Amino acid sequence: MNKKILETLEFDKVKALFEPHLLTEQGLEQLRQLAPTAKADKIKQAFAEMKEMQALFVEQPHFTILSTKEIAGVCKRLEMGADLNIEEFLLLKRVLLTSRELQSFYANLENVSLEELALWFEKLHDFPQLQGNLQAFNDAGFIENFASEELARIRRKIHDSESQVRDVLQDLLKQKAQMLTEGIVASRNGRQVLPVKNTYRNKIAGVVHDISASGNTVYIEPREVVKLSEEIASLRADERYEMLRILQEISERVRPHAAEIANDAWIIGHLDLIRAKVRFIQERQAVVPQLSENQEIQLLHVCHPLVKNAVANDVYFGQDLTAIVITGPNTGGKTIMLKTLGLTQVMAQSGLPILADKGSRVGIFEEIFADIGDEQSIEQSLSTFSSHMTNIVDILGKVNQHSLLLLDELGAGTDPQEGAALAMAILEDLRLRQIKTMATTHYPELKAYGIETAFVQNASMEFDTATLRPTYRFMQGVPGRSNAFEIAKRLGLSEVIVGDASQQIDQDNDVNRIIEQLEEQTLESRKRLDNIREVEQENLKMNRALKKLYNELNREKETELNKAREQAAEIVDMALSESDQILKNLHSKSQLKPHEIIEAKAKLKKLAPEKVDLSKNKVLQKAKKKRAPKVGDDIVVLSYGQRGTLTSQLKDGRWEAQVGLIKMTLEEKEFDLVQAQQEKAVKKKQVNVVKRTSGRGPQARLDLRGKRYEEAMNELDTFIDQALLNNMAQVDIIHGIGTGVIREGVTKYLQRNKHVKSFGYAPQNAGGSGATIVTFKG
């Protein structure tokens, strides 16, 4: 479609109304490239996508898409053989994450029938191995240590060397305190230095890196740390080299999939654009129109999207109707009506919703032409009439039966009699060529043309004679009146003068009376139509309310089932808690032996069911299935605390995972799902089995690192029981340093336990304050 009509109708401003609802740069780019098409299948597809997205929002009103940046240039660089930097990898990582989130959303979607949208969701790719590779880059733009073994080794050495430098400098701060201007370690030229008083500069051997402005302070790098600093500099160079190697290696792994990733990004943007259209529908009460096969247009309560508080109007352009001629005075809204028709058609043929009521229909036109406004050229010295006529001549040479033509103030700018005759001749030519046309004019002669000519219809814009203001209501089938006499009379002109004027045009009175009757009939019809629409709106509200109630009832059923399970679990927990209290009371009041108390406690636990049998509960089954690991899931390797991605499951049930550049084989118990870590509220109690270890007598170890407080205390209780049953003399409890909450809980527990003889922190080489050694009474 020609660009001039899009500029005339300000289509770019209309597209900008959708931008606030977009979440991705891909969607924004597709919106900006959006243009009307005459291909019916493309328009139908866009309409179907919007309707399906509306249905999706009914079930998932908070459906959203992760924001993504444009990656077309990144993928192009990959295809050309370039290696990517960290920032570019993060862009790809975000796209892959968004793709996976959308796939997961689609897999769990229920109660919605999708056809067009399903094609897009199902075309998204899953790259579990690439996702594992890209875990090497964290969101802060840092390459993780687990990206490669060599990088981890280098960074460990850097850390050790830096620790040595700090230790040496701290010792020197204490030893040379009287020689320093300040008791701090400074940094100069990337080196750690001491601020030495100038009078003592020869007392501390080392390299001078700087002198203060006053000359009183000399910044010296002590000789003891020079060699270490050089080692660190060398290691930093090795680190940079290894990071470049990692970037090159991952670039090579991603390169074969560049086109697929770019396609995924386009699909994400397309889904985002469809989502934005539906958000616009919700915000502006817009609709997806029906598509007419025969250029029939029926717009119900249509509004101009760029006009604030626009008056809604009905427009019906039947199959046989070739022209609608809007007559009447200026400033009544004729031009806005013209633009509303054209812009609504452009929006619909671009696959966008329109501001109208349900039941509206649009046609398909190969081209839309318009001559609107004063486009005269000062440089060409053209008059208003010449400017319009030049444009119209050009249009008449291009239009055909598949075009829509909009003409504003046809024949204006010249002698009224000649202008009216020319306007009628142009309209007649268009009628004979069966070209749909909407034209505005203030020539009264065209009223008769509209009445007498087949397939041509008059129309006007309503004017309120009581307030002397236009109402901007479109009155199809009713020719316009100037209302000059009524206006003059209300403004105070003498009735004698008005009477003389009306007598001079008595021959037109019959026509005016007919027009007045038509206006009254149109107003009556409009009132009836408004009443019908009110009833329809009430019905729609009731239908939505019933649907909402139905969905709420279903959700309440699921909630009740979950609540029943929680209540059952609470009862079990209460019973176990009461049994613990009973046993504590027995222990305090009697001389029962420890193993007898533990055996009694175990028997009580057996009385309580481990879980409530809700195997037939579909909601719980779905939740359980959702927690099960699957290919593509992000995981945390428990032994390393590093993130990775599951790439495949082996026949023996174990999983292969990509952790940075390292591929690992893991059992399910050796990793945890990232999503499960974030979402699970209740974890099944895990009991660490006490094992005897070789060495100095019987020993046992419990690792509580990474546990929640309640979980850690439960495991500690069970662990101590088992240690006593196995007659252990001593056990180790690893709780880490962290925030100190679990360490404090362990201390309080051991203080209360009467079977504990003593406890204390482990030696520095065995964990220090991160571990506690417990000795039991004999």
UniProtKB/Swiss-Prot annotation:
GO MF terms held by the record: ATP binding; ATP hydrolysis activity; ATP-dependent DNA damage sensor activity; endonuclease activity; mismatched DNA binding; ribosomal large subunit binding; rRNA binding
GO BP field: mismatch repair; negative regulation of DNA recombination; rescue of stalled ribosome
Broad class of enzyme this protein falls into: hydrolase
Keyword list, A-Z: ATP-binding, DNA-binding, Endonuclease, Hydrolase, Nuclease, Nucleotide-binding, RNA-binding, rRNA-binding
Binding residues for ATP: 328-335
Keyword flag Secreted: no
PROSITE patterns: DNA_MISMATCH_REPAIR_2 (PS00486), SMR (PS50828)
Assigned EC number: 3.1.-.-, 3.6.4.-
Pfam families in the cross-refs: MSSS, MutS_V, Smr
Domain Smr: 702-777
SUPFAM superfamilies tied to this protein: DNA repair protein MutS, domain III (SSF48334), P-loop containing nucleoside triphosphate hydrolases (SSF52540), SMR domain-like (SSF160443)
Complex formation: Homodimer. Binds to stalled ribosomes, contacting rRNA.
Matching PANTHER family: OS10G0509000 PROTEIN-RELATED (PTHR48466), SMR DOMAIN-CONTAINING PROTEIN (PTHR48466:SF1)
Family: Belongs to the DNA mismatch repair MutS family. MutS2 subfamily.
Function as written in the Swiss-Prot or TrEMBL entry: Endonuclease that is involved in the suppression of homologous recombination and thus may have a key role in the control of bacterial genetic diversity.
UniProt name for this protein: Endonuclease MutS2
Naturally occurring in which organism (per UniProt): Streptococcus pneumoniae (strain JJA)
